[in-house]
A protein has these predicted regions:
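A feature for loop-to-transmembrane-helix boundaries and adjacent hydrophobic helices
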Residues: 1-267
Length: 267
């Protein structure tokens, strides 16, 4: 693909960075727009969004390193190398980092927690979809070798250098699969957002939809550092995906059940 969009002398613009940045800006714009419809202060929404992005990047990078700790423990100098910085990260780690930051900020500024999460969930899905196209361009987060007609073949040595991407071999386009999933999730979440019956409904739907999709996508991922757990039964990301589905299901059940209780019964 095209890991580097163009060169000017020694300077180059990484395609991954451009698309991820675009995804972040688009996601933030949608999140702030949704927040204003929920009566949330736009300044608080913007500040929260910036904090979430920064902590999400840190969380994604930390889990990327943890998942490939056998390599990084033997080469600690590579943790802060330019190669590692360009290699992307693990989205579930970013989701955890962003969530921790969001919980802190929302509590500190007394924002309506579930309503805020509902406002941000669709933007997160769309931003992630755009970012995954950047992964395809960079060659990271690639899939297993395949004979299917939709297989993608990487030939740029930069992809191999940064992400160990196999060259000249048709691979499952896991980046495009996940981008399509997240685009569909965005459409579904916006539909729910406009019709939601209780705060937390959009967040719960996102956790369930993304958790299920990511669990199964892990079976065809083949990039190194998958972070296997329980003796290789599943990857760390699959474990996090299961936790997301359970959490989403609990939020939906608890909030919808509370809404169904007659007002006099809640006194």
């Amino acid at each position: 693909m095209f890991p580097q969009l163009f060169h000017i002398g020694k300077f180059f613009l990484p395609t991954y960075g451009l698309l991820v940045s675009t995804g972040v800006l688009v996601g933030l714009w949608i999140s702030v727009r949704n927040s204003s419809k929920q009566g949330i202060n736009p300044d608080d929404a913007w500040n929260l969004g910036v904090l979430v992005v920064l902590c999400g990047i840190i969380g994604a990078k930390i889990l990327y390193i943890v998942n490939d700790w056998s390599y990084y423990s033997a080469h600690p100098g590579d943790i802060f190398s330019w190669s590692t910085m360009q290699a992307g990260g693990v989205f579930s780690g970013g989701l955890i980092g962003a969530s921790v930051a969001a919980v802190w900020y929302i509590r500190k500024h007394r924002m309506p927690a579930l309503a805020t999460w509902d406002a941000f969930a669709p933007g997160l899905a769309l931003g992630h979809a755009i970012g995954r196209v950047g992964c395809l361009a960079a060659g990271c987060c690639y899939g297993k070798p395949t004979n299917h007609f939709w297989g993608v073949t990487f030939t740029n040595p930069i992809a191999n250098l940064n992400s160990y991407t196999p060259l000249g071999v048709p691979l499952e386009p896991t980046q495009l699969f996940e981008a399509a999933v997240e685009l569909a999730n965005f459409i579904i979440l916006m539909w729910i957002f406009k019709r939601k019956k209780f705060d937390g409904q959009v967040l719960a739907a996102y956790f369930i939809l993304y958790g299920i999709a990511r669990y199964f996508l892990e079976f065809i991922r083949d990039d190194p550092g998958r972070g296997e757990v329980f003796g290789g039964v599943m990857t760390g990301t699959q474990l996090i995906s299961i936790a997301l589905v359970i959490t989403g299901g609990l939020i939906w059940w608890l909030k919808s059940s509370a809404r169904a209780v007659p007002a006099h019964a809640q006194r």
